[in-house]
A protein has these predicted regions:
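Exported/periplasmic ABC-transporter solute-binding proteins
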Residues: 1-170
Length: 170
């Protein structure tokens, strides 16, 4: 990943639309989304397609657009570039978890993969839910619903996080 003499220049693809992935990468780089320069492409699928078709292409994306949900491997034509988390100039064994979606999800869940660029997602409401059906749905998300999280490409909550969130529903 260099532009030293004798090396080809990378083609950077970024989002042309506002999105959480760009916001988090901006934060990770100490910038904002608008500071990320490159060829603007619309949407997560657009970034993936642009990188797949350009041998010198590089971009960022949400995990579900980098890894096939069925095979749990990176999509054909995409290579996931690891982050040197401890900034020692190499990818140590503890940082090399990109071979499968499951190992990436575990690294995110355990806090090994940094946040940002990883981020939590929340359900929000104006005040506490008043309808029992809404509360029951939120409880389902925190219990039975957790078994569907990984297959949808998201990271399951830790048991202690679930307990904290369940307590808020009482």
């Amino acid at each position: 990943l260099t532009t030293k003499p004798g090396h080809d220049k990378l083609n950077v693809f970024t989002r042309s639309d506002a999105c959480g992935a760009a916001e988090m990468w901006g934060k990770y780089l100490g910038k904002n989304q608008e500071s990320i320069q490159g060829v603007g492409v619309f949407g997560d699928p657009g970034i993936s397609d642009a990188v797949k078709t350009d041998p010198l292409g590089i971009g960022y994306n949400n995990v579900i657009y980098a890894y096939d949900i069925k095979s749990r491997k990176p999509y054909p034509g995409l290579d996931v570039i690891p982050i040197d988390i401890n900034s020692n100039g190499k990818i140590d064994a503890a940082e090399n978890f990109y071979s499968s979606l499951d190992s990436v999800m575990l690294a995110i869940r355990e806090g090994v993969y940094p946040s940002p660029p990883a981020r939590d997602l929340y359900l929000i409401s104006k005040g506490a839910p008043l309808k029992k059906s809404v509360t029951a749905f939120l409880e389902w998300i925190l219990t039975e619903g957790q078994k569907y999280v990984n297959e949808a490409g998201y990271v399951q909550l830790k048991p202690e996080q679930i307990e904290v969130e369940k307590a808020k529903l009482k």
